[in-house]
């Protein structure tokens, strides 16, 4: 069975479990990928957060409580690792743990997918760039990518990061889909037409899950991005965080066409 490790930080806002990567883990598990979360969690809501992961088929045995920075995990049992900027920037121990995981993954030739998220302060830019170089696939949103390099056009941004040594980059463009580039292929992948737009909350998490599953399967980057776009479009058609199974996703991709101008109002 395919296995993925998610490094994320999880909290609870009084209504929902939250945190970058949390719902990506749930979406991957929905695809049938054996998914484990090495998460930092708010100790006050530990039971709620753990129950969320278990309910969604995510292994919670690697979770560390808020004041516990000791993660006992090795990536050698996994086919891919997903790291969020929120986890990396949480504290010094999280940073060094994520760095160690990246180094081990490189030795073991296990792909790392890194999503910087909204990394905030300018002093974090160098840290984010460093992890972009450590990852197999760097996945910034367009606005975050602009902040990282000062450029505005997706193709020029991608060229910039590839010139620095980034292996593969996928720049998410919202309703316009995504721009991708590696050393062997590049292009813009449009999104799919949505039958309806109900809630865009989980679109980014679904996109990441689709991309990671493609990386695990070792399909071309262009195909992985198309799958990721389809996942995002599926997710916005239901209330809350609703993710397709891999069978539902494949059916959706067969029955829906690309659109250049995005998923209607998405």
Would you name each region that the model predicts?
Residues 12, 145, 207-208:
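Short active-site segment of divalent metal-dependent hydrolases/proteases
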Residues 1-9, 36, 42, 51-137, ...:
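Ribokinase/PfkB-type carbohydrate-kinase core domain
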Residues 21-30, 97-103:
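Histidine-anchored nucleotide/phosphate-binding helix
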Residues 21, 46, 208:
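N-terminal Rossmann-fold NAD(P) dinucleotide-binding loop
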Residues 14-20, 64-66:
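Active-site nucleophile and cofactor-binding loops and adjacent substrate-binding regions
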Residues 27, 52, 104, 210, ...:
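Rossmann-fold NAD(P)-dependent oxidoreductase module
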Residues 16, 23-36, 214-217:
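Alpha-helix C-terminal capping segments
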Residues 30, 164, 192-261, 265-266:
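Conserved post-catalytic alpha-helical subdomain immediately downstream of the catalytic base
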């Amino acid at each position: 069975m395919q296995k993925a490790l998610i490094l994320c930080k999880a909290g609870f806002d009084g209504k929902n479990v939250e945190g970058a990567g949390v719902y990506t883990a749930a979406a991957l598990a929905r695809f049938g990928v054996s998914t484990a979360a090495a998460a930092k969690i708010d100790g006050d809501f530990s039971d709620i957060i753990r129950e969320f992961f278990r309910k969604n088929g995510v292994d919670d045995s690697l979770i560390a409580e808020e004041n516990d920075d000791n993660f006992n995990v090795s990536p050698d049992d996994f086919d891919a690792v997903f790291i969020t900027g929120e986890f990396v920037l949480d504290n010094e121990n999280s940073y060094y743990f994520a760095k160690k995981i990246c180094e081990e993954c490189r030795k073991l030739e296990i792909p790392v997918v890194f999503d910087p998220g909204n990394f905030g302060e300018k002093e974090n830019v160098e840290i984010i760039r460093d992890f972009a170089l450590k990852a197999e696939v760097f996945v910034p949103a367009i606005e975050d990518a602009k902040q990282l390099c000062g450029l505005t056009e997706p193709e020029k941004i991608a060229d910039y990061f590839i010139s620095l040594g980034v292996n593969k980059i996928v720049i998410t463009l919202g309703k316009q889909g995504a721009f991708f580039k590696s050393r062997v292929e590049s292009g813009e992948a449009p999104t799919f037409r949505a039958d309806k737009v109900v809630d865009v909350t989980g679109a980014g998490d679904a996109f990441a899950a689709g991309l990671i599953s493609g990386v695990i399967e070792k399909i071309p980057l262009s195909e992985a991005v198309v799958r990721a776009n389809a996942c995002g479009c599926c997710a916005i058609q239901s209330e809350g965080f609703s993710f397709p199974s891999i069978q539902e996703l494949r059916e959706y991709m067969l029955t829906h066409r690309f659109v250049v101008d995005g998923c209607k109002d998405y």
